[in-house]
Amino acid sequence: MASGKGCFYANFKPDNGNYTKDGNLITSRVGIYSANSNGLYDMAGNVAEWTSTIYTEAGVEAMNDINPTLKYNAAQEDPYRLKRKSVRGGSWKDPESYIRSAWRTAEYQNQPRSYIGFRCVRSLANSTSERAKSTKGKRK
């Protein structure tokens, strides 16, 4: 493009990415940044995260109380479009505007990517509130 501003459809991403602002030239080690106000670490930016939820164009509009996570185990003979999973959040390769948990895209479940990871979680539903409070902000 003669103006030098580029073109949304021809360029890699629509915004500028500042990939080295934090001093890391590659993905960063888990836990090197401070916890957020909920005591959680590394909630956005290093890698986007696989979810167990299938990807549909309708997105969250298709969710309901009966099927809140839109799970579907695609069979070998199913169309390829049914084998997409939702990927949430941005990664090291994305511009700042994508680094939020509400950002959502799709990837085929059999396609590994260097910018997509997963998050190990555990439920505090069966824990006592005191135990949950005592571990807030502490790393194991």
Regions of interest found by a model, annotated:
Residues 51-54, 105, 124:
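Short beta-strand segments enriched in hydrophobic/aromatic residues
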Residues 1-100, 129-139:
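Functional-site microenvironments in short loops/helix caps that host divalent-cation chemistry
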